Structures are given as C-alpha cells and as structure tokens.
Amino acid sequence: MRTLLIDNYDSFTHNLFQYIGEATGQPPVVVPNDADWSRLPLEDFDAIVVSPGPGSPDRERDFGISRRAITDSGLPVLGVCLGHQGIAQLFGGTVGLAPEPMHGRVSEVRHTGEDVFRGLPSPFTAVRYHSLAATDLPDELEPLAWSDDGVVMGLRHREKPLWGVQFHPESIGSDFGREIMANFRDLALAHHRARRDAADSPYELHVRRVDVLPDAEEVRRGCLPGEGATFWLDSSSVLEGASRFSFLGDDRGPLAEYLTYRVADGVVSVRGSDGTTTRTRRPFFSYLEEQLERRRVPVAPDLPFEFNLGYVGYLGYELKAETTGDPAHRSPHPDAAFLFADRAIALDHQEGCCYLLALDRRGHDDGARAWLRETAETLTGLAVRVPAEPTPAMVFGVPEAAAGFGPLARARHDKDAYLKRIDECLKEIRNGESYEICLTNMVTAPTEATALPLYSALRAISPVPYGALLEFPELSVLSASPERFLTIGADGGVESKPIKGTRPRGGTAEEDERLRADLAGREKDRAENLMIVDLVRNDLNSVCAIGSVHVPRLFEVETYAPVHQLVSTIRGRLRPGTSTAACVRAAFPGGSMTGAPKKRTMEIIDRLEEGPRGVYSGALGWFALSGAADLSIVIRTIVLADGRAEFGVGGAIVSLSDQEEEFTETVVKARAMVTALDGSAVAGAR
C-alpha cells in the first residue's frame, strides 16, 4: 500500500514514517505542506497521513496542502494531532484552547473499540503534544476516543474515509502506535476493496446533480404520475443530523419491482416492470439479504447520502413471527411491501439542490441517461413555480358524523375496555411477567380521502424528520413519524433513537415549557425510556462488535408541532460479516413498540390487543444497494385501504403508570391523524 505523508514541519514526522512503513510494507512518500498540490500524482497513492505540527489548522502556513488532502483527495486520510484538528475544523467543528497545555504528558485514552482503535484495550496510555483541541464536533463527525479531561482523542467522518487522533501514536511513550497504523492500513484497504466492487457489480449507478430545489409536493405531482407504486420519504422537518434529504420515486423504471410478503404464506411475490409475477417460498429477511448482496453497488463518492437506490417500503408488525414473536394474528395487509427503486429524485434541503439517481445494467445506459436529462428539465421547470397553499385537511376528511372518534369511527377497544387492559398490564408487571408493556389500540373510520391530499394535510399539521407517503397497489401509508428505528451505514455503523415519554404542547409559552420540563424530569417517563434503551442495547449487542454499543445521548427532549418527546440515542458497529438485513431482523420489532422483556411481553400484547397491528408499529424506510439502511418506527401514521382509514395509538405501561394518564396520552398522540382526517382536534374517545 502506497502512502503519502504530508509533513507540517514537525519534529516527529519521520517517527510516523517508520510506523507507516512497518504497517504497509512500503516506505511512505514525504512531502512538505507547502508543496504544489497540483503536481502530486495522487493516483499513485492509496492513503494519506497528515502529520502533527505547530500552529493552527486555520493558518495556511501551518496547514498548507493538508487542507486539500482532507477535502479534495478522495483518499483515506489519517490526521495526527494538527491533522486531527484540521479534519474537525474543515467540517464545521471548533478548534480552540485545550483545558491546559499537554506537551510530552501522558494520558489514558478511552475509546469505542472501532476503526483505528479496533482490538485495543480501553483505556490505554498515549502521549499528548497540544495546546489546542477540537470541540463542538458537527454531527457528520463522530468522536471515537476521549481523555480523562474530556478532550476528544479520536474521531471519524460518518461518510468519508477520514480519521483523526489528537495524541501522538508514534511517541515512544504511547501504547499501540503500530497497531493504530495497522488498523488505518486495514481501513484504507477495505475502502479500496469497496470501490473495486463497483466494477464487479452487474449494475451501474448514474447520478446527476441539479442546482434547483422545487417544493417537494410539486415534485411529487409533477414528476410522478401516481400510477402503480410510488414513494415519498419526506423530511418535512429538517433537523441537523437527523433529516436533510427527501427521496421520491416510482415503479416505472426498467429494473423496478414491487414485492409483497405475507407471513401466513411464507411466499415473496415479485411483480416485475414487464408485469410478470414470480413467487419464491423464502423467509422475508433471508430473501432481502440475498437480493441486497446480489445487487450490491458501492456508494457513489459524489453523493452526500448513502441511499444509492434499492428497496423502499415497510415491515409490518406481524413480521415479528419471523424474528422473536408468534404468529398470533393475521394482518389484512401485506406483512412487508417494498418497491425496488431503480430511479429516484433526492431533494437536498440543506444545500438547495436535487440529485437524480438511475440504475441500469452495465453497457445499457441509454434509458438511464435519457431519464436523467428529462427529469432535470422537469425539475428546473417546477422550481420557478410557486407551490400551492396546502388545502385545509377538513376538505378531505372522514364524513362529519365521524369527527373525532365519532359514531362512524371505531376503536378496537373503547375507553372502558382500554382502561381494563391497562389494569391487566399492571397486574402482569406486578406479577413479574414484564417490566414494561407497550399497549396499543387501533382506530378505523370510513373515508373518501385520497392519499396525496390527505398526506399534504398531515405533513402541514405535523412536520417531522421521518415523514413518508407510500402509495402501493393494496394500500397507502401516510406517516408523520418522529422516531428513528435504525439507521445503518454502509460502513456498519448503527444508530437507534427510541422515543418513550410524551407530553402535549402547551397553549402558552409558559405552559409549554412547564410540560417540557415535567417530561424531562418525571421518574415514570425516564424509567420507560431507560428500559427501552437497555432493550435496544441488548438487541444491538447481539450483532455489534464487542464494546462498540454505547449511548451518547440519554433522556433528551425533542419538540414537534403536536407533542414533546423523550428520546435517547444508541449507537454501535456491526460485527464483520453481519448484514444489514440481519441487524434489522435482530432488532425487529422496535423495542419502543413492544416493551421488555420483548418475547414474553409480545405474548401478553397478543392476548390483550386481540387483533393485528398491521403496518402500525412496524418499520418504514429504505434498504440501499450500498448496504446502508434507514428505517423509522411506524407511529403517527394513517393507512388507507378499501375506503377506510386506520391508525394505531398507544403507550408504555410501567409500574408507575396512571390509567387515566395513559389513556389521555393515546388521545394526544392521535391528534395529528384525526385533525388531518376531519379538521378538528381530538376531544376524547368513545
């Protein structure tokens, strides 16, 4: 492996030189940071190491071409000390004074066990030479290691092959310097293997950037005729680190497929773009795993997201029969339904542009290029149009007699019956059968609403980071979910953000803040959330590398239009050889919709709820050809089918639960759906 070593005029660069040479088997090529970047033969190198040095990364004299190496080379980069600080600063972090100067001083470094720290004990001893430190890392940079004084000692970019260490691994006083260099070598080689895999794939991804950003609903109406199967994964609320992109597409491409699966049959049914249907008897997750491997296409380096086309759809709750549950109830809808998308439009709400993605077989790209050209012209035309004002939701709602939970709407369990089931949950908890039971109720009503206008109303009422509109032949799914089930990177990084704990928004700023503070501090809500955090940690620990699962954020309050929510974040890294489908299978259904212990609690739920949940409380999103995935929990979601609307509501029952409060919480959670359907707030259930 050939390595370029950029010397920031440091006195330890050739100590790094030796460690790099030992790890790679070849001496690196050393160039000073004031070399001519344009004359460097980057095609001759496999990786770059940016050395320590004096000064600050924001000064040209101190950092020079190190900046270009990080931002422009496209190669795996390891930044050491000053190089580490440069990565942080170039992606929006802050570099300022460290708590105290640390020159030639030894610290213990604690780490996650990932990437450059793979296989190393935590803590280990390292030597530090720095007065500055990286702080306030942006979400695209992930800290991997820390010293006891709280300074970030290691980081990585979530999408690019960039790593940094603040300490000096080459120092004679540092432990495991050679191992860190060997780990970087392995990461660089793995990156290049993934790129070479693209040449082996039977498919080729074509990408075009269009520097306009039309209104998302205008794109849905103007680019997708609405026939067949369509999807709109909608970041109607753009939150840093959670939602930046929306994706739209349909089944008109030459490689598109629409597949459904029902647990009772055990058969995957696939309708191709030519109208023919094939049926395969195979467990769903096994089928999905095989197809993703067969069709694997590495992430395009010029895309700022990991969705490079693939499967878009939902996993219904009753699919639990193929993970950790029993086939107690049969859903009227497919237990899984996905569109294999070979064309998609991505809206970048942060940069104000679009990306067009088209997949074709190698050597047969005329259709893809024509679609890119035509769609770019359509988007440019849509960008000059003023988006229409959303039509009030009540125009499309259920008949007036069914307003709220009126006489034409039917809850599976009325208030008295639901309260009795809460009491049953409390008895099961008192008897030691469960710690937490996520009890839910299903509500149905006749409706004349159609999917797109109704979803337009729902997204206006409740903008969220994980919204979605799936218009499939059997049903339409309209989701205003605020909850991330799992996001899985092509590099194996995993994140889950379960929600447990809800309060309504207040009528005044003072009341709103009081409700928010009550949610943040109430023991009952924290207990609910904590138990699900531990459950999700357990699920991820079954498929993640030892020591990689951690909780960077615990009990954070997130605020949305209708409610405040208590959210925690769990992260990990998949064990080598573990597929994306295997990770989802290990965690499905999401613990925030079951309770704990999961298997026994789902048995209790099956008995008390007396019917299927269907799409509700499953998962919705995409599995990409890159090996990445992003799935939300299906909550705050309306399902339209056969002239009826249905949605689920519920809450976690714990020993501290109050029955009336739990019922009221279901009413609060229903507000967005009911308001979209009939234009009025929920007054109560009958």
Swiss-Prot record:
One of its GO terms (biological process) is antibiotic biosynthetic process. This is Aminodeoxychorismate synthase. Keywords: Antibiotic biosynthesis, Glutamine amidotransferase, Multifunctional enzyme, Transferase. In the C-terminal section; belongs to the anthranilate synthase component I family. It comes from Streptomyces venezuelae (strain ATCC 10712 / CBS 650.69 / DSM 40230 / JCM 4526 / NBRC 13096 / PD 04745). GO terms for cellular component: cytoplasm. Involved in chloramphenicol biosynthesis. Catalyzes the biosynthesis of 4-amino-4-deoxychorismate (ADC) from chorismate and glutamine. It catalyses: chorismate + L-glutamine = 4-amino-4-deoxychorismate + L-glutamate. It is an enzyme of class 2 (transferase). The active site is at 81 (nucleophile), 168, 170. Pathway: Antibiotic biosynthesis. Disruption phenotype: Disruption of the gene decreases sulfanilamide resistance and blocks chloramphenicol production.
